[in-house]
Amino acid sequence: MKLYYTPGSCSLSPHIVLRETGLDFSIERIDLRTKKTESGKDFLAINPKGQVPVLQLDNGDILTEGVAIVQYLADLKPDRNLIAPPKALERYHQIEWLNFLASEVHKGYSPLFSSDTPESYLPVVKNKLKSKFVYINDVLSKQKCVCGDHFTVADAYLFTLSQWAPHVALDLTDLSHLQDYLARIAQRPNVHSALVTEGLIKE
């Protein structure tokens, strides 16, 4: 399998999950401005949406959208317990979290990354997004991870989204439970490896 990624983007989430599964895979960097792959290919020919992440399977099939990719990967290695088994209620709570993170947190960043957003509107956007992290912080005051006490695909996604906060001047430092959680997740060997590989931290 091959993961097409851009360093520090939402593709970090499936990158982490891939490493957590122990599956064999390769990665190829994408320049989202030129829409070219690291090897010079036209990225739009691979994913006409022009977005990462993209997972290319060994048979050539293409899977896009991070929430779909992480569930697919987790199901390939059920022994890693990255997502609950089909039909288990726990699984749907995990999917509930993935959907919340995608619709409320991930999308909540969009105006902060856009040059079209009026300066006067930025505080409103930040306050709304901060409120989502306040809720998450409260959840983490009662348990080690977002879906309980063990790492799941939802944690890979939350960790990824939380990394963007400093880049948009969103202050989360007062959320102590969230900060403790992020420090713990960052210490996971597979998370550390993904961060180093993408050049986000030094070895």
Swiss-Prot record:
UniProt keyword Cytoplasm, yes or no: yes
Every GST C-terminal domain range: 87-203
A GO-annotated cellular component: cytoplasm
EC number: 2.5.1.18
A GO molecular-function annotation: glutathione transferase activity
Keywords associated with the record: Cytoplasm, Transferase
GST N-terminal domain sequence ranges: 1-81
Localisation per UniProt entry: Cytoplasm
InterPro entries: Glutathione-S-Trfase_C-like (IPR010987), Glutathione-S-Trfase_C_sf (IPR036282), Glutathione_S-Trfase_N (IPR004045), GST_C (IPR004046), Thioredoxin-like_sf (IPR036249)
Major localization class: cytoplasm
Residues binding glutathione: C10, K35, V52, E65, G66, N99, S103, E104, V105, H106, K107
Catalytic reaction list: RX + glutathione = an S-substituted glutathione + a halide anion + H(+)
Origin: domain of life: Bacteria
Known function: Conjugation of reduced glutathione to a wide number of exogenous and endogenous hydrophobic electrophiles.
Subunit structure: Homodimer.
PANTHER family according to UniProt: GLUTATHIONE S-TRANSFERASE GSTA, GLUTATHIONE S-TRANSFERASE-RELATED
Classification via NCBIfam families: PRK10542.1
The family this protein is said to belong to: Belongs to the GST superfamily. Beta family.
Protein name per Swiss-Prot or TrEMBL: Glutathione S-transferase GST-6.0
Species annotation: Proteus mirabilis
